[in-house]
Amino acid sequence: MGFITKAIPLALAAASVINGAEILETRAGVQTLADKYIVVMNDGISDKDFDSHRSWVNRNHRRRLIRRGAKAMGGMKHTYNFPTGLKGYSGHFDEQMINEISKRADVKYIERDARVQINAIEQQDNVPSWGLARVGSKEPGGTTYYYDSTAGEGSTAYVIDTGTDIQHEEFEGRATWGANFVDDMDMDCNGHGTHVSGTIGGKTFGVAKKSNVVAVKVLDCSGSGSNSGVIMGMEWATKDAQQKGADKAVANMSLGGAFSQASNDAAAAIAKGGVFLAVAAGNDNVDAADSSPASEPSICTIAASTEQDSKADFSNFGQVVDVYAPGDSITSAKPGGGSQVLSGTSMATPHVAGLGAYLIGLGKGGGPGLCDTIKQMAIDVIQNPGASTTSKLINNGSGM
């Protein structure tokens, strides 16, 4: 997820309150998207009042375009309505329109939309992996993955990423497309999402080899996207999981960016909706407290370990990290067949999402409480984990 070192000055950057809504500060290192915003409504706003607010925004935006000769803007684009209560929208507005919105008493805060990206940092083709064996063993250096034959059967993993090659032989027909918030191509043109999905539910590379995988595409071929688009994917996954049984669902987000209150609130809404969510800590070797959605306390934040049970040199750290998982030189599926090796907290996170699915298959309780279960099962082995950071490494409880 790394910060992109480009600070963009903006008249609205400083946090302020104008007759109601707070315009959140844009932190240094955030790659904001020009004239694009995320607006979050007050807690508890009714559907009727939310509809009324959106109608007001659309009317005023049209008037600005037609009557005032305002610079052409796209207006409202995405609407968010999580089943757990979080409501908001994103869009393309000029500064005057945003100032009008900020004066509304029904708006909680406004945030600049910003760029997010995947957390893989390197690749190497066709070398053996070690992560699975480590998850199933109390000692390092093993070559066998010990696991219960239930293998996550009956669970569903939502992979919020670049998409998944659902035809890959690793998934044996258990992978499906859920939603696409990027383009009209239901394919993984990057490879990151397929790799992540394989670590969760692949027949060879997966922690939960019988789990179902649902692709939720929020990142493009370069592995990049926006907070507003990612939040759309988070909302869709929450609603779909609740329809099918949230207690049987896990979600994986091997992505992120600089701190975003909207991104954190959306992650919290997933957890509140009863879905276990694993999120990458990030790859900048800094405290993950300044990263989102990794800094949201109600989810499970994952740092990356090496084959030698040490912190990977790229991995973020800090009190927000819940547990370590293998993330250095991990082999998994690639689009079109075969495998590739990637490193990053992106690769660590699906080991934990997969472990959550595996535990659901064993009959353990689902939901955000799975993070506590995983931490209780973890082993205290990570060397030099980083300041104020746990030294716990995940374990499935099956090995020697």
Curated annotation (Swiss-Prot):
| GO MF annotation list | serine-type endopeptidase activity
Lineage, top-rank taxon, reads Eukaryota
What's an example Gene Ontology biological process for this entry? proteolysis
State the gene name recorded for this protein. SUB7
Biological function:
Secreted subtilisin-like serine protease with keratinolytic activity that contributes to pathogenicity.
What positions constitute the catalytic site? D161, H192, S346
Q: Which organism is it from?
A: Trichophyton violaceum
Specify the propeptide location in this chain. Answer: 21-119
Q: Where is the signal peptide?
A: 1-20
Question: Where are its TM segments located?
Answer: none
Write down a Pfam family by its short name.
Answer: Inhibitor_I9
Residue intervals of the Inhibitor I9 domain: 36-118
Identify the EC number(s).
3.4.21.-
Which residues, renumbered to this chain, are glycosylated?
N252, N396
GO terms under cellular component: extracellular region
Can you name this protein? Subtilisin-like protease 7
UniProt keyword list: Glycoprotein, Hydrolase, Protease, Secreted, Serine protease, Signal, Virulence, Zymogen
